[in-house]
């Protein structure tokens, strides 16, 4: 089963909109369906970015309850996933990301919005407990033949993010191509290179602007990212995947619409024709989905 975290060392990388737009293509690659769904968790408990992109999709059980080990997670109540006390409380979002109605329950969402007044992990929470709870969720999803767990994590070194990284077998490392993002990402990977074991880290330059007239050499910059990302993880058991910035790929291009409002481009294509920049981004979302599904489909 695929277990993937979308991660960025700094906020503002466009991590959540990247996840939001990759989801429908990942569902197609994995052949997700209502009996073998993808489970999506918004673990960015402060910003709640994905939860805000999915208004009116609060789940009956939220991410804080998941991390604290809600009783529903440990129950083996039903052989039917749709009747299980955990999965039955999750919000179907397939249609929200452009899938047909019959595949609405192929993607189930755990919101970060708290219904019972708990808005953060308190001082009595601890790393080991959170990690244990995520493992329990992972085992439950494996037992019920879920295709994947997809986790939107907070930036930096926050508890829920580190927990997700530890539990993942693939990590999408999202960065802008600015100097701050590059240096911060390299440093974080160096720090975590021996804490994280046997991970595939997919490096994704996101919202890449037009280089024309800037004096920067895009090829040289991408080669530098490849070299330094690989060096940051050398002597560890982790593997770097730089498919999205090699073989003529230039990361995921900047989408003009997303400067004003984030959205799902596949869903948007049902309303109007996509622009050139949007179509180019969709190609890269599809490529990322293929890289994520590789070995898991």
Predicted regions span which residues?
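Conserved beta-strand segments of the P-loop GTPase G domain that flank and frequently precede/overlap
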Residues: 6, 41, 110-112, 150, ...
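Active-site signature of alpha/beta-hydrolase-fold catalytic machinery across serine-
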Residues: 21, 25, 52-53, 163
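P-loop/Walker-type NTP enzyme "switch/lid" segment
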Residues: 45-142
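P-loop/Walker A phosphate-binding loop and immediately adjacent motor/lid segment at beta-alpha junctions
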Residues: 121-138, 185-213
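Inter-motif core of Ras-like GTPase G domains
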Residues: 158-179
